[in-house]
């Protein structure tokens, strides 16, 4: 048969190989396309069936490929190539043989593995090369039959459909045999329920539904572990659990129908396995609509007939939201699955899960993880990390804390690093002094030499300790790794029924390694001086939680305890004349940091009442500065912007269907990003009454649901609302007792706000009006800020007492608080200073003295 006529009968794979063989012959300046060119092209093909056959037949692919390349180099080259190549008579003979075999097999197309069979029957140079590299005819023919699986080649893409399970699925039952699955604990009920559904006569397809991170995939891995251990009912023994790789199934599907062909090939192979394969589809909702294009089926619809007939045993896994959004819409697909709800485990169950994973993570990181660290990981993640589920978030905490310790072990200790940098500095200084000849320099050089020697000795001593510690840790990590391998081997020996080997490992090798590990740890503990941490403790877990959330969970240092005990002093340095307010806020912060505050409510919620300019907002700023070392960590919301009813949506986000739904709310987004913050609602009485309805949940439960249905945690915020209500009463009753003044103000407040709102606030605090004595201290604070601004320009400021007293006189107004004083400083001090600075009157490093001569302020 002519080659051109025959080429229409080749499969797509064989056509690609022949095209590649032609390119290879042209590239190497050969006159003809020889069998070597075709075989080389088949070897280089991605997912080549020739490679699979050669491996089954016991050949070494690397050696075969090298031998073929050497044989190609020995072929004669054309001196002046024209770029035209023809198929050689030998190649044509082989292709005719392929056609003959195809007809004998009842194939409609000629597939590439027939070329390999033709090579052996033609008995040419290529056959001798293959035999020389361990590929015997009998083994190759048997491998060809195994790959074909007794099927005829009936379409152009038949080769792509072969081994569909191997290409598009992952064997989950093989993973426990290789020791690659972490132990699954506390999910016996769900695994038993899944097995129960799998044994049903119809609708024997469980779908695991639960929030992200609760362990749906782990349940399937637990089932695979039981199948591998044969700890399952008789009907499930010997079955294979395969996970569908949807990405591989979709990748590279260039033409319409290609995806459907691949999925159909997978389903056909599963059907042929006669119930011995269980297919696991993670994120099963992605099958609804996958591969859908105009006029074609999607993957979900292709699964339905196989599920209905019972040909396909399938386990699905998806989240509650995605099940509702995708699966429930397709009722025909949904009814073929039986739901298994997977709930979030409790903190106690999570601790048990972590204890079982502990050893795996210790082996991976080469460190120790203490039991208190596991308990802390479960408890702290449950309390402080919202928006994620146990056990996933607790495992992540443990993993990151272990990674931090591992990184420290691999790095040079801080004390050695400091000495190293100091030595470099001293050596540079020594090089400079060596060039000097005067007596002072020589004395300094002598002192320097002594210091360098002392530092080098200290560094050498520390390095010796460090290297010994590193060696000890490395030794312990190696023993743990060996123990892990022995345990995997023990399980494999039990499965094989090799009880002699199992007994040797269990009662001989494992106890010996455990004893060795104990001795190593005892030696490490006995070292008097330790440079490195090699254990994850509860403190490391708390550090990671603080880093993730910004919430100070870590154990308080003595310095912080001291600061908290004297918090009033710190706040009073900036907030003058408001002792009651400062005490109330300080007590709330202390309760929280001592762990005594209600964990279901905000740290504190206060309503600050008082006239303008008395320090309500300043106290909030001071508190933010104390808690976070920055005033920027205060979420300030000006409530005068929320005077309309519809403006509530700006706080929590627009509801679905409205413009801005995807942008989130101003308040909820700010707190979601910084859960530990001071939230200030300024001028709260100016807001619409409906705004307070949204705040009721925040004040009582410490949480708020935003427009997108996400719960935002307010339990670690200090909520402060400021108001000018009753400020005229404060002025009128300034001479009366604090309680009398407060009750008069609260009457006005109760008339404006609803009782349920007032009742949820921890404390309503009335700020006093400011007296002249307070104004003097405020003037000092304001001038100190001016002094700091001038320091950046290298200028010093000194203000005489007469000048401060005059500023107080000019800026004192009982109705307006401290703000008139600020304006007086601007007008009488800052404005003249600005003119003088621009005129160049003051040079850097000079001192500006401000006085008062009885009429005007003086500047010297």
Swiss-Prot record:
Domain of life of the native organism: Bacteria
Repeat 1: annotated span: 10-75
Subcellular location: Cytoplasm
Region Linker: start-end pairs: 345-550
A GO cellular-component term linked to this record: cytoplasm
Region (C-terminal): 770-860
InterPro entries xrefs: AAA+_ATPase, ATPase_AAA_core, Chaperonin_ClpB, Clp_ATPase_C, Clp_N_dom_sf, Clp_R_dom, ClpA/B, ClpA/B_CS1
Main localization of the protein described in the UniProt heading: cytoplasm
Pfam families to which the protein is assigned, alphabetical: AAA (PF00004), AAA_2 (PF07724), AAA_lid_9 (PF17871), Clp_N (PF02861), ClpB_D2-small (PF10431)
Binding site for ATP 2: 610-617
Swiss-Prot/TrEMBL keywords: ATP-binding, Chaperone, Coiled coil, Cytoplasm, Nucleotide-binding, Repeat, Stress response
Keyword Translocase: no
Binding site residues for ATP 1: 210-217
Any one GO MF annotation of this record: ATP hydrolysis activity
Signal peptide boundaries: none
Region (Repeat 2): 87-150
Region (NBD1): 163-344
Domain Clp R: 6-150
Coiled coil: 395-529
GO biological process terms on file: cellular response to heat; protein refolding
Region (NBD2): 560-769
NCBIfam families: chaperone_ClpB
Entry text on domains: The Clp repeat (R) domain probably functions as a substrate-discriminating domain, recruiting aggregated proteins to the ClpB hexamer and/or stabilizing bound proteins. The NBD2 domain is responsible for oligomerization, whereas the NBD1 domain stabilizes the hexamer probably in an ATP-dependent manner. The movement of the coiled-coil domain is essential for ClpB ability to rescue proteins from an aggregated state, probably by pulling apart large aggregated proteins, which are bound between the coiled-coils motifs of adjacent ClpB subunits in the functional hexamer.
Function: Part of a stress-induced multi-chaperone system, it is involved in the recovery of the cell from heat-induced damage, in cooperation with DnaK, DnaJ and GrpE. Acts before DnaK, in the processing of protein aggregates. Protein binding stimulates the ATPase activity; ATP hydrolysis unfolds the denatured protein aggregates, which probably helps expose new hydrophobic binding sites on the surface of ClpB-bound aggregates, contributing to the solubilization and refolding of denatured protein aggregates by DnaK.
Family, per entry: Belongs to the ClpA/ClpB family.
UniProt-recorded name of the protein: Chaperone protein ClpB
Organism: Dichelobacter nodosus
């Amino acid at each position: 048969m002519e080659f051109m006529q025959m080429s229409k009968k080749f499969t797509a794979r064989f056509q690609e190989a022949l095209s590649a063989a032609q390119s290879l012959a042209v590239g190497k300046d050969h006159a003809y396309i020889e069998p070597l060119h075709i075989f080389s092209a088949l070897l280089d093909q991605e997912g080549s069936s020739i490679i699979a056959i050669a491996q089954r037949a016991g050949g070494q692919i690397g050696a075969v490929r090298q031998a073929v390349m050497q044989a190609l180099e020995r072929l004669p080259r054309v001196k002046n190539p024209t770029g035209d190549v023809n198929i050689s008579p030998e190649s044509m003979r082989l292709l005719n043989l392929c056609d003959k075999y195809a007809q004998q097999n009842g194939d409609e197309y000629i597939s590439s593995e027939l070329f390999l069979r033709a090579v052996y029957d033609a008995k040419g140079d290529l056959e001798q090369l293959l035999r020389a590299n361990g590929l015997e005819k009998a083994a190759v023919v048997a491998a060809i039959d195994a790959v074909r699986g007794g099927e005829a080649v009936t379409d152009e893409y038949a080769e792509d459909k072969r081994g569909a399970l191997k290409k598009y699925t992952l064997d989950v039952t093989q993973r426990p045999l290789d020791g690659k699955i972490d132990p699954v604990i506390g999910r016996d009920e769900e695994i038993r329920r899944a097995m129960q559904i799998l044994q049903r006569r119809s609708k024997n397809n469980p779908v695991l539904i639960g929030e992200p991170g609760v362990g749906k995939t782990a349940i399937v891995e637990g089932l695979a572990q039981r199948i591998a251990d044969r700890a399952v009912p008789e009907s499930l023994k010997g079955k294979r659990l395969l996970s569908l790789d949807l990405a591989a199934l979709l990748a590279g599907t260039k033409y319409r129908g290609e995806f459907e062909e691949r999925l159909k090939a997978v389903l056909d192979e599963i059907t042929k396995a006669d119930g011995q394969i269980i297919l696991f589809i993670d994120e099963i909702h992605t099958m609804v609509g996958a591969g859908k294009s105009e006029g074609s089926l999607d993957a979900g619809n292709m699964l339905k007939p196989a599920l209905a007939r019972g040909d396909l045993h399938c386990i699905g896994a998806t989240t509650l939201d995605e099940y509702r959004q995708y699966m429930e819409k397709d009722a025909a697909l949904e009814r073929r699955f039986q739901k298994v709800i997977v709930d979030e485990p409790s903190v106690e169950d999570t601790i048990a899960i972590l204890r079982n994973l502990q050893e795996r993570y210790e082996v991976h990181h080469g460190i120790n993880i203490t039991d208190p660290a596991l308990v802390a990981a479960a408890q702290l993640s449950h309390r402080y990390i919202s928006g994620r589920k146990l056990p996933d978030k607790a495992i992540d905490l443990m993993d990151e804390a272990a990674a931090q310790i591992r990184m420290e072990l691999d790095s040079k200790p801080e004390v050695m690093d400091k000495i190293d940098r100091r030595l470099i500095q001293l050596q540079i200084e020594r090089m400079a002094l060596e060039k000097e000849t005067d007596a002072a320099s020589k004395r300094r050089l002598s002192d320097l030499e002594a210091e360098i020697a002392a530092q080098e000795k200290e560094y050498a001593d520390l390095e010796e300790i460090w290297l010994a510690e590193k060696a000890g840790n490395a030794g312990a990590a190696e023993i743990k790794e060996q123990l892990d391998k022995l345990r995997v081997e023990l399980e494999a020996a039990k499965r094989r029924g090799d009880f002699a080997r199992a007994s040797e490992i269990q009662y001989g090798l494992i106890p010996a390694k455990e004893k060795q590990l104990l001795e190593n740890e005892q030696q490490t503990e006995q070292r008097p001086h330790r440079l490195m941490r090699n254990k994850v403790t509860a403190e490391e877990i708390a550090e990671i939680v603080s880093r993730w959330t910004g919430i100070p969970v870590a154990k308080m240092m003595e310095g912080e305890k001291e600061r908290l005990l004297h918090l009033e002093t710190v706040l009073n340095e900036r907030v003058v004349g408001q002792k009651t307010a400062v005490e109330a806020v300080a007590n709330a912060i202390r309760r929280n940091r001592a762990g005594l505050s209600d964990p279901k409510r905000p740290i504190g919620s206060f309503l600050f009442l008082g006239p303008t300019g008395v320090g309500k907002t300043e106290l909030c700023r001071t508190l933010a500065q104390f808690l976070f070392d920055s005033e920027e960590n205060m979420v300030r919301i000006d409530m005068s912007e929320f005077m309309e009813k519809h403006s509530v949506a700006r706080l929590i986000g627009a509801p679905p269907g409205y413009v801005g739904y995807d942008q989130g709310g101003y308040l909820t987004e700010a707190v979601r990003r910084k859960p530990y913050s001071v939230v200030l609602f300024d001028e709260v009485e100016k807001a619409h009454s409906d705004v307070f309805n949204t705040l009721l949940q925040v004040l009582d439960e410490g949480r708020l649901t935003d427009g997108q249905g996400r719960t935002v945690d307010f339990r670690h915020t200090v909520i402060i609302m400021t108001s000018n209500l009753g400020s005229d009463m404060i002025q009128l009753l300034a001479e009366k007792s604090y309680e009398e003044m407060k009750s008069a103000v609260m009457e006005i407040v109760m008339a404006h706000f609803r009782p349920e709102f007032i009742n949820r606030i921890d404390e309503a605090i009335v700020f006093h009006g400011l007296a002249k004595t307070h104004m003097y201290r405020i003037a000092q604070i304001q001038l100190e800020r001016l002094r700091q601004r001038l320091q950046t320009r290298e200028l010093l400021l000194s203000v005489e007492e007469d000048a401060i007293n005059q500023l107080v006189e000019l800026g004192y107004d009982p109705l307006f608080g401290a703000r008139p004083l600020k304006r007086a400083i601007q007008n009488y001090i800052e404005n003249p200073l600005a003119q003088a600075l621009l005129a160049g009157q003051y040079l850097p490093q000079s001192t500006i003295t401000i006085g008062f001569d009885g009429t005007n302020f003086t500047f010297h």
